[in-house]
């Protein structure tokens, strides 16, 4: 028995394939290579069989049917249905002689063919609106896309949305693009993207975009060579720099400023507009250009020459921007996007640590654990304590890639010293468990960040009074503002539990025994 396939035109519905008997004349030429169906099918439920052939029971299972050897088969599909061609020589005229295992294989082929039809671009199922929308999906970024901030702009591709402010040659600002969906397969760092984006737009939207040079939105600039030395927002400066004629005289001295990178000369933490900021001084490398002082956020990331991504507060940077960083030090050269020395981003050892771990944007704060392990290990070794077995996880690799322990630290290094002392207690507990301490909670992390600032604001108050003020501010904060500290505290707690599970049990046991 042979089946001819036709399609009924059904308005506003998916077209159904109806099986009808082939009544072609048996004398039709066999030389034509036709579309054929090489499967035996039972009668369709509720469909009257042809009188020329035997009627079959209305059963759900497929059964072998005796076919008339005088008839040939046609498998006809309308132009809007996907299909495949099979040579006529492969068609068996006597289907009853096909063994049972062959029928099973043909069943799979038949189901595959139906799946191909249903999922083809011409299928009405695939033409529904919910298949055409641009829905964000998780895709894995390659190691080369991790440093999209430092990648040179694409040469052959024409961007749909150009840079906000034009610059010259490779120095021009790099726009933020979506990561290509067909090139991600290696790294475990995840980002959000859309499959409908252009292949040429190969930038990940989870990385920050610079406004001018290597500075993000919200940074304030002060050029020492200017007579007035006024502070100006980086957005206003970049907007003025884009005016070729009007501001040519004023901005001429800053054209190409720091094109080979900005060398960090000094840094301090200060308060600006009621917010704790970093005040950094850079040297552009040329005497005629003069020095530059900037005020930026504590979590501002920088791409450092021969080092990779760096930050003064790696824990804050990874939570805020999703970028795992080394610690930046005096003497580091911060490069602008697209700099030739910034294209060798695969040499940045910091990302080698994360290649075998899958972190989604929701738990990106877990990467903080790895970034803090270098400080824990250095603090443990400097104090004379041996590194714990659990601490060998990846701290040594991270420490090697992020510089020597003797490098310069922040002016607020006392904060780090306290934090490291608390964090490194888990390492010391590998040899002396009684010294194990619980990690800091969200409020403690918040207080650690702002205690120096509030001490400077209220010089006459002692530490306890400062804690009360910090507590009042913490209560007034919104949940969105607390989230960063909550994620960081959660990551610390999970790592402490992993390294010292018995320490947590012992704490509860001791507290219970003291109550009795």
UniProtKB/Swiss-Prot annotation:
Compartment(s): Nucleus
Effect recorded for residue 370 to D: Strongly reduces Sin3A binding
SMART domains given in the database record: AXH, HMG
UniProt GO BP: negative regulation of lipid transport; negative regulation of macrophage derived foam cell differentiation; negative regulation of reactive oxygen species biosynthetic process; regulation of DNA-templated transcription; Wnt signaling pathway
Record field: compositional bias (Basic and acidic residues): 166-182
SUPFAM superfamilies: AXH domain (SSF102031), HMG-box (SSF47095)
Top-level taxonomic group: Eukaryota
Region ranges (Disordered): 150-182
PROSITE patterns (UniProt xref): AXH, HMG_BOX_2
Ranges of biased composition (kind: Low complexity): 156-165
Alphabetical list of InterPro entries matching this protein: Ataxin_AXH_dom, Ataxin_AXH_dom_sf, HBP1, HMG_box_dom, HMG_box_dom_sf
Keyword Translocase: no
One Pfam family per UniProt: HMG_box
Function noted in UniProt: Transcriptional repressor that binds to the promoter region of target genes. Plays a role in the regulation of the cell cycle and of the Wnt pathway. Binds preferentially to the sequence 5'-TTCATTCATTCA-3'. Binding to the histone H1.0 promoter is enhanced by interaction with RB1. Disrupts the interaction between DNA and TCF4.
Subunit structure: Binds TCF4. Binds RB1. Binds the second PAH repeat of SIN3A.
Protein name (Swiss-Prot/TrEMBL): HMG box-containing protein 1
């Amino acid at each position: 028995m042979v089946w001819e396939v036709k399609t009924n035109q059904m308005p506003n519905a998916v077209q159904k394939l109806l099986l009808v008997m082939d009544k072609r004349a048996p004398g039709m030429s066999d030389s034509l290579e036709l579309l054929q169906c090489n499967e035996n099918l039972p009668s369709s439920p509720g469909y009257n069989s042809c009188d020329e052939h035997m009627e079959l029971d209305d059963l759900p299972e497929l059964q072998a049917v005796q076919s008339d050897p005088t008839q040939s088969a046609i498998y006809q599909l309308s132009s809007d249905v996907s299909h495949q061609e099979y040579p006529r020589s492969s068609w068996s005229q006597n289907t009853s002689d096909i063994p049972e295992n062959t029928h099973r294989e043909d069943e799979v082929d038949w189901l595959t063919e139906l799946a191909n039809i249903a999922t083809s671009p011409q299928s009405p199922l695939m033409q529904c609106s919910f298949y055409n929308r641009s829905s964000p999906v998780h895709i894995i970024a390659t190691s080369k896309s991790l440093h999209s901030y430092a990648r040179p702009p694409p040469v052959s591709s024409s961007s749909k949305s150009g840079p906000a402010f034009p610059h010259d040659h490779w120095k021009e600002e790099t726009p933020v693009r979506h990561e290509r969906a067909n090139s991600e397969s290696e790294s475990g760092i995840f980002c959000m993207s859309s499959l409908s984006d252009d292949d040429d737009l190969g930038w990940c939207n989870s990385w920050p975009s610079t406004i001018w040079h290597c500075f993000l939105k919200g940074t304030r600039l002060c050029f020492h060579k200017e007579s007035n030395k006024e502070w100006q927002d980086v957005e206003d400066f970049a907007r003025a720099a884009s005016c070729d004629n009007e501001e040519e005289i004023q901005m001429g001295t800053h054209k190409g400023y720091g094109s080979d990178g900005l060398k960090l000369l000094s840094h301090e933490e200060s308060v600006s507009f009621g917010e704790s900021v970093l005040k950094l001084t850079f040297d552009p490398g040329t005497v005629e250009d003069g020095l530059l002082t900037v005020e930026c956020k504590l979590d501002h990331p920088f791409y450092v020459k021969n080092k990779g991504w760096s930050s003064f507060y790696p824990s804050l940077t990874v939570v805020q921007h999703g970028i795992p960083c080394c610690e930046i030090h005096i003497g580091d050269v911060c490069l602008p996007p697209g700099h030739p020395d910034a294209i060798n981003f695969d040499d940045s050892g910091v990302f080698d640590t994360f290649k075998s771990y899958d972190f989604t944007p929701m738990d990106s704060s877990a990467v903080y654990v790895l970034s803090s392990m270098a400080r824990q290990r250095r603090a443990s070794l400097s104090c004379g304590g041996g590194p714990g077995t659990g601490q060998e996880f990846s701290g040594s690799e991270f420490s090697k890639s992020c510089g020597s322990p003797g490098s310069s630290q922040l002016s607020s290094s006392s904060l780090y010293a306290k934090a490291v002392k608390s964090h490194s207690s888990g390492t010391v507990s590998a040899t002396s468990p009684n010294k194990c301490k619980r990690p800091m909670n969200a409020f403690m992390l918040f207080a650690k960040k702002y205690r120096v600032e509030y001490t400077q604001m209220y010089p006459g108050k002692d530490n306890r009074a400062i804690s009360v003020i910090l507590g009042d501010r913490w209560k007034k904060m919104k949940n969105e503002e607390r989230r960063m500290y909550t994620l960081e505290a959660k990551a610390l707690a999970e790592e402490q539990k992993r390294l010292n599970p018995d320490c947590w049990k012992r704490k509860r046991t001791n507290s219970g025994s003291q109550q009795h």
